[in-house]
Amino acid sequence: MNSKIKKDLKDIISKTIKELALRESIKLEEINIIMQKPPKSELGDLSILIFEFSKILKLNTSIITEEIIKQIGDKYATKAMGPYLNIKFNRKEYIKDTIKKVNEQKEKYGINNVLKNKRIIIEFSSPNTNKPLHIGHLRNDIIGESLSRILKASGAQVTKINLINDRGTHICKSMLAYKKFGNNTTPELSLKKGDHLIGDFYVKYNEYAKNNEMAEDEIQQLLCKWEEGDEKTVQLWKKLNQWAIEGIKATYKLTNITFDKIYLESEIFKIGREIILKGLEEGLCYKREDGAICIDIPTEKNEISEQQFKQKVLLRANGTSIYLTQDLGNIVTRKNEFDFDEMIYVVGSEQIHHFKTLFYVANKLGITKENNLVHLSYGMVNLPEGKMKSREGNVIDADNLIHDLSESIILEIKKRNSDKKDYQEIALNISLGAIHYYLLKTAIHKDILFNKEESLSFTGNSGPYIQYVGARINSILEKYDELNLSNETINFDLLVNENEWEIIKIISEFEEHIIKASKDRNPSVIANYSYLLAKSFSTYYQDTKIIDKNKPELTHARIDLSKAVLQTIKNCMHLLNIPYMKKM
């Protein structure tokens, strides 16, 4: 719905309710105006629930409705139906205003200020340096990237952060395997990306550990050497990490994932220790008999039991920190650096308990309030054969997935058009559109069973379908330009069929969908909106002759409508990090 009309109606209704409340000597705390689509289009374009006001004002619904209708006057057609007031827009004005707004604002169409001046940090990706990115990482990456763009479109100041986990037992496992089986190989010698090479050694370690009881002890010894700064160990660690990080960054570049700041855990992991010691001095946590520093956190309570607490270690007795301690240090670092209003962690649902604990402790130690921290948990990406396990090599690597999809598309392109020269770029863009859309169209809290064939479909709810509709509209516009028809004035009054009206209503709701996606922290809102718009235009295109040389005025109007659809689809694709292609 046109936001200007929505605001206008809300202002009228709010003013009317306030006046009625004053007349009836009733104190109003808040006016909640519920607007929704009527169940049938013939009832109107918008339905307003009046019954709620009737309960507050203790007046008959018909009295309130009559007063609102008086205030609306002849601006909109109105009709009372029981507890609802149905509104019909002036279609001609609505169509003209919507098309003009989109085609004038172009890539800025849909941008709003609901989060104006709000400083938001989004931490996402956060890979380990012992393996390449896999499809689960891709879901994390695209959620973080897309949500960042959506929040920016709603006026927020967004900072995208990546904390690379480059220390700990996971990288030591790859290091140990490299020492035993590496034979001084390199990415160049092995003809592999660095992250893939390191991932191979991670799998080799787990094979080795199955038959060697001392493997875990060897890992702990290697970790101790690293912590003590042993020169050879640190050199090996730096070399393997460099290979892994270079490989991971290459995948980011391929998938168009960017960050404003990248942290390495090895550079900041000690900061949290100082915070805990300060909390101990202030009596916010306590020292256990064995020397460990702890804090009591509330457990989940049921309806009949009193709140129970359990002990949580923040610093071990030997003075070493745990992941929670490091995360506390990271919060302080970012608060000092960015002075954020909100920090969002895009992390899988298996970490829900960790973040509940982290946020509670951060609040308890006075670092920041719990409601400034958000764990945006997402569901797992599973394969038809079951859950992925990196240590067993049972994963779909991101690079390999993109390559496999691209190869499938290249074969199809060569079948249809062997003369295409840029087929590799086209195939890459289609594969990225397929992956990103497939991972975003499902609500983020739900698990996904990844289906390659479904993701590549050109006829269903998929990225390639939306890309195809965009390319189809561009082709229509190019054909129109070749005709060079005179179009001094455009008569939007000629757009009278129901398909055109349906498309206009969908286009006009784009800003509302961005706002909803921002508030819900859910890119699937935009993904499914883009599919709805693309599908509606496809139906229109099949049923309607858009370019008719014998009806130039009607053609001009329909072309301007098509331009508005394409611009809105392109804006959606930007928010979803899906490549737009003029031709496919």
Swiss-Prot record:
GO terms for molecular function: arginine-tRNA ligase activity; ATP binding. A motif ('HIGH' region) lies at residues 127-137. It comes from the Bacteria. The keyword tRNA processing does not apply. PROSITE patterns: AA_TRNA_LIGASE_I. Its EC number is 6.1.1.19. It is an enzyme of class 6 (ligase). It catalyses: tRNA(Arg) + L-arginine + ATP = L-arginyl-tRNA(Arg) + AMP + diphosphate. GO terms for cellular component: cytoplasm. Keywords: Aminoacyl-tRNA synthetase, ATP-binding, Cytoplasm, Ligase, Nucleotide-binding, Protein biosynthesis. It is found in: Cytoplasm. SMART domains: Arg_tRNA_synt_N, DALR_1. GO terms for biological process: arginyl-tRNA aminoacylation. The keyword Protein biosynthesis applies. HAMAP family: Arg_tRNA_synth. Belongs to the class-I aminoacyl-tRNA synthetase family. This is Arginine--tRNA ligase. It comes from Borrelia hermsii (strain HS1 / DAH). The gene is argS.
